Amino acid sequence: MTIKLNLYGKEDIGNYILLTNSYCIVPHDINSKNYNIIKSELDNKINIICTNVSESICVGNLLIGNSKGLIVPNTITFHEQNELLNFLPEKVLVKKFNENLTNLGNLLAHNELYGLSSPDLSQSSCELISDVLGVEILKLTLGEEKMIGTYCKFNINGGIVQPFLSIEDHDELVEITGVPFIGGTVNSGCSNVGKGIVCNDNLVFCGYKTNQTEMHIINNIMKKSKNK
């Protein structure tokens, strides 16, 4: 079942959490209720790392990561980077992103195999992301939207994309990633699904305003089932 979260009174929980198959990063001052909800769902199988990034609580916006690697902005402090290095699994490769773009989480949607990138990212940045995360990167837009990470979220099971996408663009997503996609919303009608959903291949969290119909769609497309 998808779990609802309310972080800092906001429903855009993807701004504040990075969840992968091997680690979870949350801000230092996350309240104990939300921390315990996340910890309970992770069931001690995934380490939770509490840190800010660039002195900001928006760790989900500022980081890009999966179980193989983590990319941090060039504005990260020495102390913050050391916190990550001390608590991340040893196999996770950490590299600094040197372009003057800090909202990395808005520019890329990815799982363990593929990354969908905003055309605003340079080729050298895409190559860095590909090397660190071990994914194939493809540049595209979602209709007229360039902020791929804001309007798309997917894992190894399937994905949600903003609902105003053409059939051709939808079919391209399926062909590129090899997973099913569905147009949908989160938080009672918001199309920024990449900000309202946090997931890995086994768990899905969503913003607290997400209604039952939206949760049903998210569960069906993003959660593992015996039929997939």
Curated annotation (Swiss-Prot):
This is Eukaryotic translation initiation factor 6. The lineage of its organism: Eukaryota, Cryptophyceae, Pyrenomonadales, Geminigeraceae, Guillardia. The gene is EIF6. GO terms for molecular function: ribosomal large subunit binding; translation initiation factor activity. Belongs to the eIF-6 family. GO terms for cellular component: cytoplasm; nucleolus. It comes from Guillardia theta. SUPFAM superfamilies: Pentein. Binds to the 60S ribosomal subunit and prevents its association with the 40S ribosomal subunit to form the 80S initiation complex in the cytoplasm. May also be involved in ribosome biogenesis. Monomer. Associates with the 60S ribosomal subunit. Keywords: Cytoplasm, Initiation factor, Nucleus, Protein biosynthesis, Ribosome biogenesis. Gene3D superfamilies: L-arginine/glycine Amidinotransferase, Chain A. InterPro entries: eIF6 (IPR002769). GO terms for biological process: cytosolic ribosome assembly; ribosomal large subunit biogenesis. Pfam families: eIF-6. It is found in: Cytoplasm; Nucleus, Nucleolus. It comes from the Eukaryota.
